[in-house]
Amino acid sequence: MRELSINNNSKLFALLLNIYNPKENFEITKNYFKSENPSDLIHSAQKTDCDILALRFNVLSLDELPKAVSLLRALLPYITKPLMICGTGKKEIDEKLLPELMKVLDREQCIISFATENTYKSILPSVIAGNHYVVLKTPIDINLAKELNILSVDMGLSLDKIIMNTDIGGLGYGYEYGYSMMEKVKLESPKDDYLSFPIISDASVESLKTKEARFDNFPDSWGELLKRAEMIELSSCAGAIAAGANIVVVNNPESIKFLRELV
């Protein structure tokens, strides 16, 4: 099992898989793996060049928690890459789901993604007890990011277990604001202990949600849809790297080889 070390100099790539409901993976993910079986996905992902394997448990309701926990327990023996556990992004689910998933983890130093100002009180106790990293996600605002970092440390979270997600849009102004926010944090971090943390970017996830990456009703000059989506992922990730992201989430393993040449 590989050790995970994350700091402000890290340049790591996390491969994201919607493992609970693989049908929700982006087309560029489906096209690469050509399977929607969780075991097959894990087996294939282990052979990729990703530094971190990010598994998203995209349950629809609290009734599905036992099934999600059972799935993680069944997959853990086959996972040797550093692991990131991702929730749904919905407060009422994640504050229950993530602690339950952490109970069955058979290793320390996993990344738990993510806690917000609305969920950190429910999620952090399990993070601390399991000696895991946690992604603290805030809207695009440096003061809110710093505040959540301080509140988390006050709860007992070690400084070296914090990873920041300062949020970003998928396209246009939202992407530009998110890019500028990462730059600002990196500029301020040398003189502020509560901003001096690694940053994770899921810009590719947001970019692949846009209509430009999902629909084929564009002029021929835009190119074939699948190739266009691949280029959108590469472009969004390249910008995040330039802005200073230490961990970049990708959905297509083939993106990693190209992106490594940028760091």
Where is each model-derived feature located?
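An N-cap/entry alpha-helix motif that binds or orients negatively charged groups
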Residues: 1-6
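Active-site mouth loops of central-metabolism enzymes
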Residues: 9-40, 62-63, 87-91, 111-114, ...
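Short, well-ordered coil/turn segments that N-cap beta-strands
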Residues: 9-13, 49-51, 79-83, 106-110, ...
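Glycine-rich, proline-tolerant flexible connector loops at the mouths of alpha/beta enzymes
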Residues: 24-29, 46-81, 85-92, 258-259
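Short, acidic/polar
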Residues: 34-46, 94-98, 231-237
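Acidic (Asp/Glu)-rich catalytic clusters
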Residues: 42-49, 72-79, 99-106, 121-130, ...
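Catalytic beta/alpha-barrel core
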Residues: 53-58, 62-64, 82-93, 107-120, ...
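Catalytic alpha/beta core domains of metabolic enzymes, predominantly
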Residues: 118-262
